Amino acid sequence: MLFFVAGSMKDRYHTLEIGRLGGAVREMGELDNTVFIYIVGDNGTSAEGGMNGLFNEYTYFNGVAESVADMLAYVDEWGGPTTYPHMAAGWAVAGDTPFAWTKQVASDFGGTRNGMVVHWPKGFAAKGQVRTQFSHVIDIAPTVLEAASLPQPSSVNGTVQAPIQGASLVYSFNDAKAPARHTTQYFEMFGNRAIYHDGWMARVVHKLPWAAQPITKLADDTWALYDTRSDFSLANDVAAANPDKLKERQALFLKEAIANRVLPMDDRGIERVNAALAGRPDLMAGRTSLTLHSGMKDMSENVFLNIKNKSVTIVADVEVPAGGGEGVILAQGGRFGGWSLYLKDGKPTYSYNYLGMQRSSVTAQDPLPAGK
């Protein structure tokens, strides 16, 4: 039920806000000459909930498994403000019908394909029609530029711009049978990779969305081949019957991967969120101390010390009023994971919240006296 309620709420919200935007443009007298491009969806449904679902999605992002027993303890709270639940993967697969896979599986249309609506009365005469030419999100910028009769920028504020990839979709607006101009496209995420070319799709499913580790090593992956012209949902693997075509597509993927800096391929998952583990530049890299002042709140995690799984020392200058102090001194995170240093009944207390599954606190015996 939660799955359908959430979808219904999103649909109503989107409909309302799009209606407001359209109404404002209509009042300006520019509705017929305004290009509306509405992409419906978010690269498939989310399967991170695994086989049983989650009461706190942050457990997934921290690589911590939830057991059914863990979740049953929250059965009466499920869906309320004390949980941050995620549906089971079965719901995600059902939501991506007729495709086999979900978000994160960039090598399947279930993890990439979305509907799109274009509205531009002065730009084309067709109404209520469907276009089937292959297209990709990188086609949107060229489409907008052509519709507005603008050239692709060669530089912005003195910075030379890389050429915009993709092909404008304007050619298809008044010609449903026009040959597709976007004929080749690579896909890759977490080692899940594919290449589309002239109606054929070669792909690898390397890592499942709910799994901590890939299925195999990258070098041991098995490729599949599909003819999307007759197999919309990628249901029939024809690699065995077309070995030469599969080899051609594999070589083409490698060419595109090199050209678009996909290599070296990184099939890690959660580790890539942590800059120190991922090996990428980090604003706070090497910092061992940080000074904060009163009023500094709602700071992004990227501008705070990474203290995960580390011992830390917190030194706080506080002024305790007469009658005792109360309240938070420093906190990171919240209900679904984090820690806090605060005064409770005047006593310094440190609390650690392990992803909502376990809470630990240490409290001083005596309250702080008044003064600094």
Predicted regions located by residue number:
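Histidine-centered active-site microenvironments of extracellular/periplasmic hydrolases
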Residues: 27-120, 203, 208-213, 279-284
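Short, aromatic/His-centered strand-loop micro-motif at the edge of beta-sheets
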Residues: 354-372
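Glycan-recognition/cleft segments
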Residues: 328-349
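Long, internal low-complexity/basic segments
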Residues: 1, 50, 140, 202, ...
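Short, solvent-exposed loop/turn and secondary-structure capping segments
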Residues: 22, 33-35, 46-61, 127-128, ...
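Beta-strand elements within well-structured catalytic alpha/beta cores of enzymes
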Residues: 7, 11-14, 18, 25, ...
